[in-house]
Regions:
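Sec-dependent bacterial lipoprotein signal peptides
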Residues: 1-18
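Short, low-complexity N-terminal intrinsically disordered segments enriched in polar/charged residues
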Residues: 19-49, 57, 61
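Short beta-strand edge/turn micro-motifs at domain boundaries
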Residues: 22-24, 119-155
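Hydrophobic pocket/interface hotspot
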Residues: 43, 55, 69, 128
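A short gly/proline-enriched turn/hairpin at secondary-structure junctions
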Residues: 56-71
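Solvent-exposed coil/turn segments that connect beta secondary-structure elements
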Residues: 61, 90, 107-111, 129-133, ...
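Surface-exposed, charged secondary-structure patches
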Residues: 75-127
Length: 155
């Protein structure tokens, strides 16, 4: 009985030691996804604080019609006193391909309030395309979440 118990204990210790292998560094895809998430958080934070330069630092110089996008965002910052922008991180998919850009699809919602108290609510599902090397926003596929519904035609 004692031999059996000792044998079981030794087997348990051997398996425990084998399970405690060395830590492996995160794979490149995980590092890229973390960079994209960090950029998204930075975009959302700068947008809510209405910090145009910080916001545009996270947008690639290759973004289509970047100057018009910047002017549109500046107009929104001027028009609305309070902006609340929420990303639903639990409903997100990040696709990373070694040879192309990475794409992050997520749900979002926002509230834009004017000085007069009028509130515009909007939300939806959108895909952001990121440069895998620098994790900067290259393009938006779908409705632009940074332009509220009533302003969509005035970009």
């Amino acid at each position: 009985m004692n031999r059996t118990l000792a044998f079981v204990a030794i087997i348990f210790i051997v398996f425990s030691a084998a399970a405690c292998g060395k830590k492996t560094p995160p794979q490149q895809a995980a590092v890229q996804a973390q960079g994209a998430l960090s950029t998204l958080r930075g975009l959302a934070g700068a947008y809510e604080k209405k910090q145009l330069s910080s916001f545009m630092d996270k947008v690639s110089n290759d973004y289509p019609d970047r100057q018009a996008f910047s002017q549109s965002i500046a107009g929104i910052f001027t028009k609305y006193d309070t902006i609340r922008f929420t990303v639903q991180y639990t409903k997100m998919i990040i696709m990373i391909d070694e040879r192309t850009n990475m794409k992050m699809t997520f749900n979002w919602d926002g509230d834009w309030q004017t000085a007069g108290g009028r509130i515009v609510k909007d939300g939806g599902r959108v895909s952001f395309v990121y440069d895998p090397k620098g994790a900067v926003l290259l393009s938006i596929e779908g409705k632009n979440p940074f332009v509220p519904k009533e302003s969509q035609g005035k970009q």
